[in-house]
């Protein structure tokens, strides 16, 4: 059963928070395709066996006619199921127009006080009809890649690694400050 997951988040962190739920969907339906607004999610999930494909939705705006543009994109995937981890009537309609048989999404008009983890967990459990969905994410990296990194890093001095990030100019400390 070809299944898609729509993650309407531009930041890598918000997308990775949802990875545990994507894995639950993949365990039920097989490897999934993730459609996202995050530029670098594809590279982060390159080694994940439960993720078939990551599609970066580059030019998507929030106008009414964009429903039809998005539906054309979704139609190309031939999904039988799509789970939309966001309360968007626009995305839901685009999926219906694309002819996707089973469209699941958050309740519409419930964006205020939307808790990223609790809402995703409850949505996953309800949609998949499971008792409990883990909230901790498993991150897959191939052994060959880890071995290559270990061989390239010298252990004769102390290392400090900073994992800073920012999704865009509206965040507390804009992304251009990290470049």
Pin down the residues of each PLM region:
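Catalytic machinery of carbohydrate-active enzymes
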Residues: 1-179
């Amino acid at each position: 059963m070809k299944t898609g997951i729509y993650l309407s988040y531009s930041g890598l962190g918000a997308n990775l928070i949802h990875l545990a739920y994507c894995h639950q969907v993949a365990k039920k339906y097989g490897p999934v395709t993730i459609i996202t607004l995050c530029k670098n999610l594809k590279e982060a999930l390159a080694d994940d066996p439960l993720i078939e494909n990551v599609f970066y939705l580059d030019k998507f705006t929030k106008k009414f006619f964009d429903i039809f543009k998005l539906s054309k994109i979704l139609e190309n995937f031939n999904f039988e199921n799509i789970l939309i981890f966001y309360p968007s009537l626009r995305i839901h309609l685009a999926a219906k127009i694309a002819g996707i048989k089973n469209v699941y999404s958050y309740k519409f008009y419930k964006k205020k006080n939307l808790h990223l983890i609790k809402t995703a967990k409850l949505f996953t459990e309800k949609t998949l009809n499971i008792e409990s969905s883990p909230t901790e994410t498993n991150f897959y990296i191939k052994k060959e890649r880890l071995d290559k990194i270990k061989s390239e890093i010298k252990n004769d001095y102390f290392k400090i690694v900073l994992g800073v990030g920012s999704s865009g100019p509206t965040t507390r400390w804009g992304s251009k400050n990290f470049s």
